[in-house]
Swiss-Prot record:
EC number, as in UniProt: 2.4.2.22
Main location class: cytoplasm
Protein's cellular compartments: Cytoplasm
Record text on subunit structure and interactions: Homodimer.
Residues annotated to bind 5-phospho-alpha-D-ribose 1-diphosphate: A128, N129, G130, Q131, A132
Pfam families, per the entry: Pribosyltran (PF00156)
Family: Belongs to the purine/pyrimidine phosphoribosyltransferase family. Xpt subfamily.
Gene Ontology cellular component annotations, sorted alphabetically: cytoplasm
GO molecular function, one term: xanthine phosphoribosyltransferase activity
Keyword terms: Cytoplasm, Glycosyltransferase, Purine salvage, Transferase
Name this polypeptide is given: Xanthine phosphoribosyltransferase
Top-level division of the source organism's lineage: Bacteria
Source species: Bacillus cereus (strain ATCC 10987 / NRS 248)
Pathway of action: Purine metabolism; XMP biosynthesis via salvage pathway; XMP from xanthine: step 1/1
Length: 197
């Protein structure tokens, strides 16, 4: 997605060979116009999948998930990382290790909002080692719902998360795929485009 790649190049900051900071538009301050375009792109890519619900994880996945849900006309349910006094019982639970925060979180979804009749699109802001996506897949599978695919805003293709998910037969659609963050520079994966004759 060209507009997203341009935003990453203009406003993202490479902090190391593994870490890209995009808090200027995605995971701290949010650019609503960009989020709207991201939502439209996810809806376009998954429109034939009969999505009934979008599942994401708090908090950075919420903005792109809501915009995609708006385009698809479905609801969003987000996995919580913290226990809530209002959500104590009747929860699906999974453990997720955060590479960025270097900690394991217990994530949960209420059983009241997802069931075996749902066809789910999972959306998240980043895909690196795949732990968040695998945790969300576990929650969806515990509910007996089917997974239509995973939409990722930014994939670090040099890490193994995307490979792990695709090897499980899951459709993964990433809007920006980063090949490298070496030497403080963002390099995107170049996809071959077929020539139309």
């Amino acid at each position: 997605m060209k507009v997203l790649q341009e935003k990453i190049l203009n406003e993202g900051k490479v902090l190391s060979g593994d870490v890209l900071k995009v808090d200027a538009f995605l995971n701290h301050q949010i650019d609503p116009v960009l989020m709207q375009e991201i939502g439209k792109e996810f809806a376009k890519r998954f429109k034939e999948e009969n999505i009934t619900k979008i599942v994401t994880i708090e908090s950075s996945g919420i903005a792109p998930a809501v915009m995609a849900a708006l385009e698809l006309g479905v609801k969003v349910i987000f996995a919580r990382k913290r226990k809530s006094l209002t959500l104590q019982d009747n929860m699906y639970v999974a453990n997720v290790y955060s590479f960025t925060k270097q900690e394991t979180n217990e994530i949960s979804l209420s059983r009241n909002h997802i069931d075996e009749s749902d066809r789910v699109l999972i959306i998240d802001d980043f895909l690196a080692n795949g732990q968040a996506a695998l945790g969300l897949m576990s929650l969806v599978e515990q509910a007996g719902a089917s997974i239509a695919g995973i939409g990722i805003v930014i994939e670090k293709a040099f890490q193994d998360g995307g490979k792990k998910l695709r090897e499980q037969g899951v459709r993964v659609e990433s809007l920006a795929e980063i090949a490298s963050l070496d030497n403080g520079t963002v390099t995107f994966v170049q996809h071959e485009t077929a020539e139309v004759k």
